[in-house]
Amino acid sequence: MKYFFILVLLFCINLQASQNDGEKLFKKYCWGCHHETSMAFGPSFNQIANQRDSGQIIAHIVNPKSNYQSLGYKRTAMPAFSQLNAKELQDLTNFILSFKDK
């Protein structure tokens, strides 16, 4: 039981660090069009988190033109962010998903 508690604690610390890194990426790449809980040019992270899973979010960040119709959009003005590596994509996605139900 003690080891389980330690593993849970380590997971929570890693998730928080990932979300912090994701917030930095949000401020660098996303803030001009998206806000955390209110509508801007693009949907809020709250709206995205409540309607998408992590795979859909990552696919849309990397290549929005590939799946915008399947996500219910008629068009997309979002540029591709294919320069982000796998860790950055996961960090940004963890940050976005932290707004679920907020």
Which residue stretches match the model-derived regions?
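Sec-dependent N-terminal signal peptides
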Residues: 4-13
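Gly/Gly-Pro-rich "capping" loops immediately C-terminal to redox-active cysteine motifs
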Residues: 23, 35-63
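Acidic/polar helix N-cap motif
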Residues: 13, 18, 85-88
